[in-house]
Amino acid sequence: MLRTHEAGSLRADHAGQTVTLTGWVARRRDHGGVAFLDLRDASGVVQVVARDEILDAGGARELRNEYCIRITGDVRLRPEGNDNANIPTGAVEVDTTALEVLSEAAPLPFQIDDHLNVGEEARLKHRYLDLRRTGPANALKLRSAANRAARAVLEEHAFTEIETPTLTRSTPEGARDFLVPARLAPGSWYALPQSPQLFKQLLMVAGMERYYQLARCYRDEDFRADRQPEFTQLDIEMSFVEQDDVIALGEQIVAALWKLIGHDVPLPLPRMTYEEAMRRYGSDKPDLRFGLELVECAGFFADTTFRVFQAPYVGAVVMPGGASQPRKTLDAWQEWAKQRGARGLAYVLVGQDGELSGPVAKNLSDTERAGLAAHVGANPGDCIFFAAGAVNPSRALLGAARAEIARRTGAIDESAWSFLWVVDAPMFKSAAEDDDVSIGEGSWNAVHHAFTAPKPEVVDTFDTDPGSALSNAYDIVCNGNEIGGGSIRIHRRDVQERVFAVMGISEADAREKFGFLLDAFSFGAPPHGGIAFGWDRVVALLAGVDSIREVIAFPKSGGGYDPLTAAPAPITAQQRKEAGVDAKPETKKAAAGEPAGA
């Protein structure tokens, strides 16, 4: 090794020892022929004292920030009154006897300073410098600790870590695939997996019983805030289990993870049905750190003459103190709603005298005006926001308003942790209302994915009434973030084929895209289920950062662009030709036992 000690490891009991350290100059201060250097390595910072003659001997007179150096010297206690209680090494300094410059540093694009705000574009372009800062470096160390903690839980339960392919065939799972040309098969393409879903189910058929991996996944999605085209999930699958078994394991993992930051998660976690979450909170991932529940108002307005409220659904959410908002702010709420696809956000203001005002109030009957505040639980000085129309989009709008109200009013306890399971989600949703890529031609898409088992009580009827069928699925939510989700899987070929049929996937398409899975189900597939945690989001929550980019070593910026390497980038004409990008696939000759064209 080029060093005897790590810089951040030195303490008062090292005084009198001769050490050799390596690292980067974080700061230089000159005082009367002596340079005081803050030497930083991955373990921390220590003060190094170097006289001018030492710098001259090492050819380091021009030493400046971020030079990479090696020093040898004697550890000594700092002079009385010069201790630095803000750093672990603050009781000592190293009196340098030799200094060697290992690598010089060019002028920096930004200062390596934990207290300096640097634009994200510059940080990502020079990520190798950004990671020298304490915050970004600690985020990656926390991620590594989370990996170890999860592995420890799974190893304790005799799970086997297995890697699944990252070059496979395109089997759409709700988003677009990233495609890779196969040079040795011109005109044919691999796909990068959106998840290891099918392979982990095949591992259950193979008898592995307990599988996990920290899996890299890829989804070619349109730009969404805080999404990455490549991401990591902790992927888990188990044979011969029921929903409660998977949930219990998931809770053990969550408890181990949050223990890393000193928080004890009380187990078992509460559960809530999907229907209850949407009805009370307007979200399938409700943040329960605050109240502000939605109030159903369709019955209250059953006899209304106000046409807007003559709708299948009318709901409300109360903003405490919201009546004091100026007209400009109330108008801005309308723009906020329109950005979410709504026509607006109706409101009623409750005056300090209890009188109602606002554009909606004048359209209400005396009876409605008299009873509205009590019905929704509003007090004088509050604002009542309404949504009316189709049930699902109206609830979703109020759910978003609820979260926005909490942010604006400071109702969220930022130090709190709130976990819950959301269970019994619908199996299917209308394809017309779905933003994801449809994998079939039918009018129904899977809410989770096409391999989620129905609740046992609807196994025989889900395809005759898809809209009311519930899935044997479970999502875990933390502070309004879905951090993981899973389900009991389909393990019967006939059930899987019926699900494909509901989604409009023909027998021929099912055979072409998923034939290997259907075939596997013909050979004694065990009942199985699993869960996957969104690892980037989990670590971001643990680290207390707003963006998952902060916990990824080399993240992409908006639109999947990498400022560091300038990827994606064009390829040369020669590369295009060699890869067979424009080639047409040749029809394969059927091998023995293989169908033609397979």
Swiss-Prot record:
Its main location: cytoplasm. Residues 197-200 are annotated as: Aspartate. The record marks 31, 81 as: Important for tRNA non-discrimination. SUPFAM superfamilies: Class II aaRS and biotin synthetases, GAD domain-like, Nucleic acid-binding proteins. It comes from the Bacteria. It is found in: Cytoplasm. Residues 575-591 have a biased composition (Basic and acidic residues). Aspartyl-tRNA synthetase with relaxed tRNA specificity since it is able to aspartylate not only its cognate tRNA(Asp) but also tRNA(Asn). Reaction proceeds in two steps: L-aspartate is first activated by ATP to form Asp-AMP and then transferred to the acceptor end of tRNA(Asp/Asn). Belongs to the class-II aminoacyl-tRNA synthetase family. Type 1 subfamily. This is Aspartate--tRNA(Asp/Asn) ligase. The lineage of its organism: Bacteria, Bacillati, Actinomycetota, Actinomycetes, Kineosporiales. The gene is aspS.
